[in-house]
Amino acid sequence: RWRREAERLARTVDGPDGADDPAYIVALAYPERLARRRAPGSASYLMAGGTAVTLPPGSGTADPEWLAVGVATRDPGRSEGYIRLAAVADERLARRAASDLLTTTDEVEWVDGDVVARRVERLGAITLSEKPIRDPDPDLLGAAVRRGLASSGLGLLSWPAEATALRQRLDF
């Protein structure tokens, strides 16, 4: 395992590209601290490790979409931490430095009475992209429908009169 990790790190720093970039160095040291802005114009970021952090006003980073967070603190009782030290990054850097955190999964969910199927690419807790799936895995589809019926009830189904009569007799 250590040999694989050493080889991966060596590949990422070969050559001049990124070797002296502070964001790249921080991202290699702490890949779980790569952070993406949660909404346009927001000072709130989500780190790959799942922690939300806030960039203080006047930080001098010019409102970047991505940061490599070197130091963050969180006060007791607060849900978000504060960024104390960070370097401006981008998605390309994040993908290179934290390639082990990249995952692509198919998700099929029951949402408001409908089945939603999508392919989601993530860097840790950060969603990079979502694309609809036309033909989801039948097992995932079945599980989503079962969850939907369990939460919404059998009233969602259209029952023929004979089936309704049978259910009423069985309920007796």
For each feature predicted by the language model, list its residue ranges.
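Acidic, serine/threonine- and proline-rich low-complexity intrinsically disordered segments
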Residues: 1-44, 65-172
